[in-house]
Amino acid sequence: MKFAVLVFPGSNCDRDMFNAAIKSGVEAEYVDYRETSLSGFDGVLIPGGFSFGDYLRSGAMASVAPIISEVKRLAAEGKPVLGVCNGFQILTEIGLLPGALLHNDSHLFISRNEELEIVNNQTAFTNLYEQGEKVIYPVAHGEGHYYCTDEIYQQLKANNQIILKYVNNPNGSYDDIAGIVNEKGNVCGMMPHPERALETLLGTDSGVKLFEAMVKSWREQHV
């Protein structure tokens, strides 16, 4: 398995994403936003940061980058796509995930570890966690308030697309939502950073199982 780690101007978590992929036992390669092909890749990791300086709004300019059409193609083919923080914002901008990310209710940038609950462990991203398991991931965002209409929220609940919730909601997200998947279950977006939760020495290794779950799910289908 080989992951593409996208790099935009202003990305600052691409190295963490790369290391997370390698730690899970697969290959990874950085891919510049100006590229027009993701041939040879089995999945996509869209890192956090401030793509294009977050001008217009977070993820807006990245959403029209040349590489995005290939991200959509891989998603349509059922390949795993994970967007974290700014990556989640980009996935909502390009329509691969519903909803939007708004300014935190506090209007402050929040940077700290947060306790989260796995509320759906039947996905390609969470199948190594226990249902209801509590995990610790770092958060680092100013626009992490997940918002959606009541209609979309009901669809998310009906389709079991909400996978991760905050225990102590730090940003005002609708129903404490921290992470979701698309209906097919192969595209995932979350504001917390599992790629920064790989070492107990640094405070938490709760993120290890998320990347291992992605690899496990892919191998079950292809090996």
Curated annotation (Swiss-Prot):
Gene label: purQ
Keywords for this protein: ATP-binding, Cytoplasm, Glutamine amidotransferase, Hydrolase, Ligase, Nucleotide-binding, Purine biosynthesis
Name used for this protein in its record: Phosphoribosylformylglycinamidine synthase subunit PurQ
Subunit structure: Part of the FGAM synthase complex composed of 1 PurL, 1 PurQ and 2 PurS subunits.
Location of the Glutamine amidotransferase type-1 domain: 3-223
Location of this chain's protein in the cell: Cytoplasm
Reactions catalysed: N(2)-formyl-N(1)-(5-phospho-beta-D-ribosyl)glycinamide + L-glutamine + ATP + H2O = 2-formamido-N(1)-(5-O-phospho-beta-D-ribosyl)acetamidine + L-glutamate + ADP + phosphate + H(+); L-glutamine + H2O = L-glutamate + NH4(+)
EC number: 6.3.5.3, 3.5.1.2
Protein function: Part of the phosphoribosylformylglycinamidine synthase complex involved in the purines biosynthetic pathway. Catalyzes the ATP-dependent conversion of formylglycinamide ribonucleotide (FGAR) and glutamine to yield formylglycinamidine ribonucleotide (FGAM) and glutamate. The FGAM synthase complex is composed of three subunits. PurQ produces an ammonia molecule by converting glutamine to glutamate. PurL transfers the ammonia molecule to FGAR to form FGAM in an ATP-dependent manner.
